[in-house]
Amino acid sequence: MIRLSKRQIILLHDQLVEETGGMSGIRDDGLLESAIAAPFQSFGGEDVYPSIQQKAARLGYGIIKNHCFLDGNKRIGTHAMLIFLELNGIELTYTQVELYQIIISVASGESDDKKLLEWLLNHETWKAKYTKDFSWGFYCTNNIQ
């Protein structure tokens, strides 16, 4: 599994702010570290968030709700979540309006990380896969058990 580092998220934030406007800078370093670490917590040797989708939802939710940055928390939370999914082979299909609605819902407190996870799962893209025995099969990247 590919993880985004704190440095990568800060660089992504700086790039977003430069391109879309707003203030650059971290408001609370501890809250940023917490948001980045939360998806990878374990308890009793088991991941609290075992699937890639669960980790992505928790990452996006944590950055948005922790208000780690001076500005652009919704933008970077969304961007980090989507990049994390893409880096780990999960593709989504959605409109900008759908994405906007779920992110505003999370930011306002109307939706939690479970609702965000549900949204991610409902927007996963099904892919065609060519198997070893030269037959075509279809699979969804959803690996929640």
Predicted segments, located by residue:
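FIC/Doc superfamily catalytic core
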Residues: 1-145
